[in-house]
Each structure stands twice: as structure tokens, then as C-alpha cells.
Amino acid sequence: MAQFFKAKPNSSKQLSAKVSLQVTRLDHLGAGIAQHNGKVVFIPGVLPGEKAMVQLTEQKKRYSRAKLLNLETHSIDRVEPKCAHYHQCGGCDLQHLSLEKQRLHKESALVSLMAKLSHTEAEALVPAIIGEQWHYRRRARLATFYHQETKRTTLGFRAQSSKEVIDISSCPVLAKSLSELISPLSKLLNQLASRRALGHVELIDVDNGQFVVVRATKELSDKDKEKLLSFAQEHKVNLIVQGNEGELLVIKGPKELPFYTLNSDIKLSFTPGNFVQVNGEINRAMVDQAVQWLDVKADERVLDLFCGVGNFSLPLAKSGAEVIGVEGVPEMVAQARINAKQSDLSDVTFFHTDLSADLSKEPWLGKVDKLLLDPARAGAFESLQWLKKMKPKSIVYVSCDPSSLARDSEPLLKHGYKLKKLGLVDMFPQTHHIEAMALFELS
């Protein structure tokens, strides 16, 4: 029997439809939620209580998406975005909401996700860890794009849900020293003969100065290197070129790697590409709270999974306890060992392990008194399948995605742990990103 294509009735008309909707709340990603024809509609850039004229852009069985055309009413919580690039750049998405309401929204979203996905509530919701709302980022990666037609390179952040690079002149969430580099750096890149071979540019502001790391897919000419050196000297920054294989060419810089300190006596060095928390002020407070919550004693054994370069491991080792740090990136494990040595901490050992793999034969797997987890957005679900082998009395889980925290809470609850404390860590003001810290104790 022949079958003929039959277009869905009015599908194109439905997508181009302009409708006026009442926004009731925000989802955990910061988008406004409204109702239309019995379905939820997600609308970026709007706030609860606002009425907005929108255009439908996507239709699914259970929900739709729309873009804001204009506001018909304004929320009292709406503020004027500080950034001139806010409506094009995809870096921030909540600058239009007052800071107080941003934090209340994030706390509410965190508690709601935990209740919905893990069916549990914390015995205590602790005060959020908060800091400066502007100029807090000590590190950022800017994208570049070479335009074949104009022979120019654009430097900036990508647009929301797009590969397009937005040309920016400054950034109010970057450290001032880094934000002030963007315009002259953009001018410099467009003077290089090898500008079409440039990748991303990393900006770092830490204890031993500002670093500019330029990714290049081929070796730069001597003239280009001279221009980079002149820029570094004029702006008093360290400048490094990173090659295709990760090799580093220091154009101007100190003999030591970038580093930051914790508690004045713990020095954490890292190489470009290593993960470190971008908000130094919040990171220090977060580490202090984790150490306080775990309350480690000198005779205890502590396991730090996803330990990075030792951000939590080394402060925990100051207690005199035996600390074991485990990390999946070998270069970071090597750096963590160096950091322990330069901070004169001998009771800490680091292992390289793929924490999503079979851990049964790992030498470090065994009974521990305390456990700290600081995984990436994917969470620590696979690692927690080995909880019976570890049996810690207390667990601190530092999360950069409340959905994975809620999911990972399930095996903890099944093994007899209770959620004793939960708190927001506002690592990224002006964005929807939610970081959190949770304390679980064996009941």
C-alpha cells in the first residue's frame, strides 16, 4: 500500500505564532515558565509576574520554547543589566534579575530539585556562601573566530546555545585586571600574521600575576612572537603560547607556574588547562566550610575523590589525618603531588584513577572515616556504587549541578545516610549556575 507524506497541520504557523503569556516562575536554568494550550512554555529573559509577547520557536509533545519579543509588564525585581553585551553574549543569563532574588531563586531551585529527584529534605538549610557580584572571575577562556571575508579575528564569548563568537570589549564579571585586557588583546591578535591559526585565549589572575595563554594550532613566526612579547611587557602580564599537543612556550613569565594560596600557607600551582575554581573568594570560603563540616581528626583516614590539584586534599591534610586524593587526569595528579611537597604536607597520597570504571582492584579502595566528593557536572554515581567498601561516617558532597547531586543522593540514602546540611555556594553570580554543598552522615 502506498504511503504519502502528510504535513503536520499548521506546524509552521504555530512556530511563527506570537502570543501574550503570563510568567509564573523560573526553572532551575533561569528561564521563565508560562502556560499555553495546556503545555509548559520556557522563555529566557523573563521574570515571574511579567506578561510578555513571545514567539514560539520549538514545539514538543509536553512543552514548547519561545523567545521574548517585548515585555508588556515589568517585575519589580527586574534590574538593568550592567554588561553592554548582555543580550548577545551567552556568558551570563540572570543580570536582569536583582542579586537578592537570584540567590533566593537558586536556593529554592536547589531545595526543589533535591525533594523532587531524591525525595529527601535537609535537616538544616545553611546560609549560602556568597561574595562579590561583579569582577569575581579570576579565570576565563575566550573563544576566537577568524572571518575569511574580512581577514579579522573576533575575540569573545559564544552566544547562548550557539557557536557564534560575540565580539566583546569588556566583561563585568571578570577580574578588572582581566577585563581591561580584552580590547588591547583583540587588537593584538588582529596584528598577528598567524591569526587564523589561533584557538582560544585563556586569561588568569592569581597570586603571582596575570597570565594570558594563547592557543595556537601551528608555530608562530618570530615577528608574531615579538609582538606578543611587546604586548606582555606593555601590559605587565605573563604570556604563554600553548601548542597543539599542549606544549607551552613562555614568551614572558616567571619560572614558576600560576598559583593561588589557601590559609596563607597552602600553595596550589596549576598549569593552563588544569581545573581550578574560577571564583577565588568563594573557593576559600567553600574549602573552609568543607573542612569544618567533616571535622577531621588526626587519627582518621580521609578520601577525596575528584581531587584535582589538591584544593580540598591539602587543607584536610593540615589536620594530621591520612588523606588520599584520587583524580582522573594524570597531569593534575602529578601537580597535586608537587603541591603537597611544596606545602610540606607528607600525610597525603595521590592516585590516578578513572572514577567511572571498575574500582575493585584499586589499592586505595577500603574503609575510610570521612569522604569528600567534588565531581564534574556528570556527578559521582559510578563511584558511589563502591560505598560499601568505604563506609565513611560522614560525606561532604560539593556539587556544580544540583540535578546530579539529587540523583547521587539516592544510593547514599539507601545505605543509611541522612542529609544533615545543605547550602548554596554562589560561585557564579549573574548566571543561573547553581553550586551546592551537602553533608551526609551515617545514621
From Swiss-Prot:
GO terms classed as biological process: rRNA base methylation
Domain TRAM per the UniProt entry, residue ranges: 12-70
Catalytic activities: uridine(1939) in 23S rRNA + S-adenosyl-L-methionine = 5-methyluridine(1939) in 23S rRNA + S-adenosyl-L-homocysteine + H(+)
EC number: 2.1.1.190
Keyword Iron: yes
GO molecular function: 4 iron, 4 sulfur cluster binding; iron ion binding; RNA binding; rRNA (uridine-C5-)-methyltransferase activity
PANTHER family: 23S RRNA (URACIL(1939)-C(5))-METHYLTRANSFERASE RLMD, RNA M5U METHYLTRANSFERASE
The protein's name: 23S rRNA (uracil(1939)-C(5))-methyltransferase RlmD
Organism listed in the record: Shewanella woodyi (strain ATCC 51908 / MS32)
